[in-house]
Swiss-Prot record:
SUPFAM superfamilies: GHMP Kinase, C-terminal domain (SSF55060), Ribosomal protein S5 domain 2-like (SSF54211). ATP binds at residues 93-103. It catalyses: 4-CDP-2-C-methyl-D-erythritol + ATP = 4-CDP-2-C-methyl-D-erythritol 2-phosphate + ADP + H(+). HAMAP family: IspE. The gene is ispE. Catalyzes the phosphorylation of the position 2 hydroxy group of 4-diphosphocytidyl-2C-methyl-D-erythritol. GO terms for biological process: isopentenyl diphosphate biosynthetic process, methylerythritol 4-phosphate pathway; terpenoid biosynthetic process. It comes from Syntrophotalea carbinolica (strain DSM 2380 / NBRC 103641 / GraBd1). InterPro entries: GHMP_kinase_C_dom (IPR013750), GHMP_kinase_C_sf (IPR036554), GHMP_kinase_N_dom (IPR006204), IspE (IPR004424), Ribosomal_Su5_D2-typ_SF (IPR020568), Ribsml_uS5_D2-typ_fold_subgr (IPR014721). Its EC number is 2.7.1.148. One of its GO terms (molecular function) is ATP binding. This is 4-diphosphocytidyl-2-C-methyl-D-erythritol kinase.
Amino acid sequence: MESFLAPAKINICLHVLGRREDGYHELAMLMQRVSLYDRISLSFIEGNDIRVQCDGLTLPLGQKNIAARAAQALFDRAGIRRGLDIVIEKNIPVAAGLGGGSSDAATVLMGLNDMLGLGLSATQLMQEGVKLGADVPFFIYKHPAWATGIGDKLQEVEGLPPVWYVLVNPGLEVSTAWVYQNLRLTSARDNLRIPRFSGTVDEVVELLHNDLETVTVERFPLIGEIKQQLLGLGARGALMSGSGSTVFGVFSDGDTARAAAENLSSRSGWRAFAVEPVND
């Protein structure tokens, strides 16, 4: 058995530029991985079945699980038939705007590539990943990224300052499909550019924007309340990540971030995490 860490992500900004003919939306986003991890353990077993175990949580299992589909996709590409046990130690909240499922799938692709000695490049793995989900290539890319298209066209963003984030999840599961179905598109913006950084926290705060937030907040006003609580505990700015329901605050230092996370973790049903960027 070999184990791998699958990090969460946040969207520092998320702009919806329009609806495509294929039903997806054209996006422009700044995405960053953060130090909240699922642990994925992989071990080969007799036969050809791919089994998924995730103790303590209700997740799709078997081929309904994105991690299992990732394993099958890699086996198919390599022309391999193997049995596999996938054990997921789930720490990233589910359906929370943090990309946990996509990260798990990306980690399975990369882990099996190493374990089997396939030698597939990151680009080749990303080609498989995008078939599983739009966010999967980002976790294979392993850099802060300006993501366009459906989120699958990635350009590295350099110079992001060493800020801290506090992630707050109130235990609400939000359907990404529902959010996009209820999104009212505004006029397109054609002046968006890859952000440049000189290393200050204010540069991150100035970018905070999420077109999906108005939809989710209308149904779940608690998200707006969490933003205000983060600001009251020292956050320089706060935003919903992805389609929600997780909210993150931007902090200048670890001590203030950890104190805020401890405070917010005491609320019934809430989970809060002080995290740092993952840039390698």
